[in-house]
Amino acid sequence: MSYTVTLRETDKKKVYVDPGIREGIYLYPGEIKKLKLLEGSMLEEDEFERIRLQYALPRAKHRAIAILAKRDKTEKELRDKLQQSLIDTKTLEETISYVRTCGYVDDLQYARDYIYFKKGRKSFLQIKMELQKKGISSQVLETVFEEEGGQEMEDILMQIK
């Protein structure tokens, strides 16, 4: 299948390559020049996918790792941050899958760490609400709070003895 390329400038740095039928990708002007993409030119689906895999996907992975290098994030927080970077849906999903597979994003571990650092200063209800806002699923919360509830009971028993 062939697409007619539409180039739309989004800001000073990126140009949106819109194939018309499916979601487009963002490329830098230098990349568009290198690829010799012109307004109205025809682009085959496999060529569009090759460009996405060669340019958009590595850039998205690099961006995700840069975001996570500064501070741990939940999957939802990372997804929201990447969407602000004008990353197309398919590339976004592949990037999230990549960082999850590599262990860079782990909502269960994030919730455990968050509870560990906050439990002395905040109630479990406050912590639970904050984690829900951060996009932690109810299933993960249930698992973590079951673990933590058992630990809390052990701590209380140790203090009594």
Residue ranges and their predicted role:
Residues 1-161:
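An alpha-helical, amphipathic repeat domain used for nucleic-acid recognition
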